[in-house]
Regions:
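Active-site hotspot residues in diverse enzymes, especially metal/ion-binding acidic/histidine motifs
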Residues: 1-213
C-alpha cells in the first residue's frame, strides 16, 4: 500500500535514473530509444503483465492496476481498443505502474502469504478520475523513465521554436503518448500549450500576448 511519503521532483527523477542504470548494468548495453519498458519490468523488477476485465464505475475509465503481492500489472482488456488506437498508451501506463512499484509499494509485504480465502485487491488503478499525489508522482516517474534526460536533451538542444510536428516526432521516437512529451517539455520550461492547443515559448509569453488582446 502507499506510504504517503512526500517526494521531491528531483528525487523522483533520481529514482528513475537509478532504475535505468540498474537495467543498463544488467543487460550490458547502452540505453537507446525506445526504452524497453516491458523487459525492464519483467526482467529487472520481476513484474508480470496480465490482461483481464477490470470493473469500472459509471463515467470512469480504468486502464490498469497493480497487484503488489502477486507482482502483477493487470491491464483492462475492455480497453484494448483504446490502447490499440492511442500511440504510446500501453508503454506509458506500464511505466506509470512501475513508478508505483518503485515509489509506493512496501517491498517487505510482497512475499507475505495472503490471508486464506481473500483475493488481493488491485491497487494504484490508472483511471480517468481525479488524480492523487501518488498518481502524479507515479506519472512523473514514468516521464523520466521513458523520456530520460540523456536521450532527450541531444534531440532538443538546438530547437528554437517547438511545433506540433516536432512534438509528434518525439512521441514516435520515445513511444509515449503526446501528452507525456508536451508535459515533459513544459516542465523543462521550453514551451507552453494554451487551451486552444497553440504552442508558445513560455507561459510568460502567452500571458503577455493575452494581455495585449
Amino acid at each position: 500500500m502507499s506510504n504517503s511519503q512526500f517526494f521531491r521532483p528531483e528525487t523522483i527523477e533520481r529514482r528513475a535514473s537509478e532504475l535505468l542504470a540498474k537495467y543498463k548494468t544488467k543487460v550490458g548495453v547502452a540505453l537507446a530509444l525506445p526504452i524497453p519498458i516491458e523487459r525492464l519490468a519483467e526482467d529487472l523488477i520481476d513484474l508480470q503483465i496480465l490482461w483481464q476485465t477490470l470493473p469500472e464505475s459509471e463515467n470512469e475509465t480504468v486502464l490498469a492496476g497493480l497487484a503488489p503481492r502477486k507482482k502483477l500489472v493487470v491491464f483492462n482488456e475492455n480497453r484494448l481498443m483504446l490502447f490499440d488506437k492511442t500511440p504510446g498508451l500501453y508503454r506509458t501506463v506500464l511505466a506509470h505502474e512501475v513508478g508505483h512499484w518503485e515509489l509506493h509499494v512496501d517491498k517487505a509485504t510482497v512475499n507475505q502469504l495472503p490471508i486464506p480465502g481473500m483475493d488481493e485487491q488491485l491497487q494504484y488503478l490508472f483511471r480517468s478520475e481525479k488524480q492523487s499525489w501518488d498518481e502524479r508522482n507515479a506519472h512523473l516517474f514514468m516521464s523520466h523513465l521513458l523520456v530520460p534526460e540523456p536521450l532527450l536533451n541531444p534531440l532538443i538542444r538546438n530547437v528554437q521554436d517547438f511545433d506540433w510536428p516536432f512534438l509528434y516526432k518525439l512521441r514516435d521516437m520515445f513511444q509515449v503518448t503526446i501528452s507525456v512529451i508536451r508535459i515533459r517539455l513544459e516542465r523543462k520550461g521550453l514551451l507552453y500549450v494554451d487551451q486552444r492547443g497553440d504552442i508558445h515559448r513560455s507561459r510568460a509569453e502567452y500571458n503577455g500576448q493575452a494581455r495585449m488582446v
